[in-house]
Amino acid sequence: RQYGTEQNPKKLQDLIGIRVVLYYYDDLSICRDIMESTFQMLDHWSRTNATANEFKATKINGVFRFPSEYFKVYKKDMWTLPIDTTFEIQFRTVFFEGWHEIEHDMRYKSLLSDNEFWRGSEELSRILNCILANLELSDWSLVQLFEQLSYNHYKNANWELMLKSKFRIHMDDNSELDPAILELFDRDKEIAKQFFKCKRKDLIRELLKLDAPQPSYNLIVKLLND
């Protein structure tokens, strides 16, 4: 595609493109909020649109302005080219990252048309779509599984395991909750319930305010309490 021509005066917006692969489906909205609060966004997020009967890889793409302090990294001559002062970022889950590579090689980037490639084996094409549907279900189910697990630990007063499964933050295996906090939660489950009801995105937002945080059970409780 030719940019900066009379027929297409648009500028290239993704000279720099970043792909971020996430563990969990609900991380998509968290990362979206982080980007919107950190950089100036152009237009809106481009996201997967599928009907109730369709299955497509879940991803979101956004275009943002370069902070002005980064302009000096590039030669001035470069900005005379049809290149916009923007970058593009894409978020997708780890399940769909693997799928994306297979799908592009075997479908979208193939020189053969999709109909020609699958001719005589339409049932296999449907099975491939079923695999995609299972990936979408896996993304959703994984989050729901840990939500239920955290609730079970809450009901059984397993406070450390409740925090680990609720917030899904990587921590040192030797991390332990302060005995005074354990005693407080054991004595008053309503207090423990307030921490159980906290949102994961709020914790991540607070962690991002720290320089090189080392997550632990005690730090989680402190940040959520503050």
Q: Positions of the model-derived regions?
A:
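Long beta-strand-rich cores associated with HINT superfamily self-processing modules
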Residues: 15-143
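Active-site acidic/histidine clusters and adjacent loop/turn architecture
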Residues: 1-22
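Short, charged low-complexity intrinsically disordered segments located at boundaries
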Residues: 2-5, 62-69, 161-175
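An acidic, glycine-/histidine-flanked metal-binding catalytic module
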Residues: 83-225
